[in-house]
Amino acid sequence: MTNAVQTHTPAARAKPKKAIQGEKLRGYDKVARIPIKIIPTVEAKKKPDWIRVKLSSPAEVARIKSTLREQKLYTVCEEAACPNLPQCFADGTATFMIMGDICTRRCPFCDVGHGRPNELDKDEPRHTAETIQGLGLKYAVITSVDRDDLKDGGAMHFVEVLNESRALSPNCLIEILVPDFRGRMDIALDLLTETAPDVFNHNIETVPRLYKAFRPGSDYQHSLDLLKIYKERRPDIATKCGFMVGLGETEEEIYKLLDDLKAHNVDMITVGQYLQPSKDHAPVDRYVHPDEFQRYMDYGKKIGFFNIWAGPMVRSSYFADRQYYGEDCPAPIRSKKALAAEGKLGC
């Protein structure tokens, strides 16, 4: 296993930019000040054949992007450079990212820009609701950047989006993918307990050993507690959690992570391959084989999760409606040549 980070000072580079309100810092400027420094990637690992996405309709992708720009909205699909964007947009689905496009955290696996965010857009809840209605969505996913600058972490803004969206699209199910509300858990959970989504999702991202390197400013147990406490308050609402593999974790650590999530009453799980957004982000430690993802799904079913999706291209909101309704995880797209080489052609 290779090290994804270093604890000594790297070769000298230009001094990183300082955060200016409303300006996004990306790449080196974003990660330069995290505790464990990233070694810029010189040569990325070659992607295996199973890192593939389905071809999509350019016209539908363009239509959704046009609608989003008209309403001045962001999607995590675009801001985090999700590889599934063409497929999801062509399917008429998108994960809306509220509270702006500037995050107050500096996670080195994420492509969302860091900095000092602007004030909340008071029209964003209405614009989000109008877009959900205009696209005719039956299932919508709402996520956000971290907003450590807000007294409630942005929980009330989630509530306003929920209320506006349900007023215009009462039959649309809404999943929220929330930040950890660090230092604001009680007030955030009070608000989201009273005005609840259909699915409460929070990503734990990685195993506890890797938190200092990959989730600076976050706490593993805090994320577990957020999920457990919400389920205790609203046992009628499905809880969900996602994490990545390929950052340097071991298979045994993943099984322990799944045990922890089950012990904290999480209902649904997503597990996906980490893909490096740029040379200045954390490098890929390894590409996890589809057979290993299958072992995680088998284990998750064995210990009693309602549904677990694990695969190279799985993300927390990947076909979220299908997972909610209990469908099985789609198989990864692979070439016949690769399957034949593994003796699996026709299986």
Curated annotation (Swiss-Prot):
Pathway: Protein modification; protein lipoylation via endogenous pathway; protein N(6)-(lipoyl)lysine from octanoyl-[acyl-carrier-protein]: step 2/2. Binds 2 [4Fe-4S] clusters per subunit. One cluster is coordinated with 3 cysteines and an exchangeable S-adenosyl-L-methionine. Its cofactor is [4Fe-4S] cluster. It comes from the Bacteria. SUPFAM superfamilies: Radical SAM enzymes. PROSITE patterns: RADICAL_SAM. Gene3D superfamilies: Aldolase class I. Its EC number is 2.8.1.8. InterPro entries: Aldolase_TIM (IPR013785), Elp3/MiaA/NifB-like_rSAM (IPR006638), LIAS_N (IPR031691), Lipoyl_synth (IPR003698), rSAM (IPR007197). This is Lipoyl synthase. It comes from Psychrobacter cryohalolentis (strain ATCC BAA-1226 / DSM 17306 / VKM B-2378 / K5). The gene is lipA.
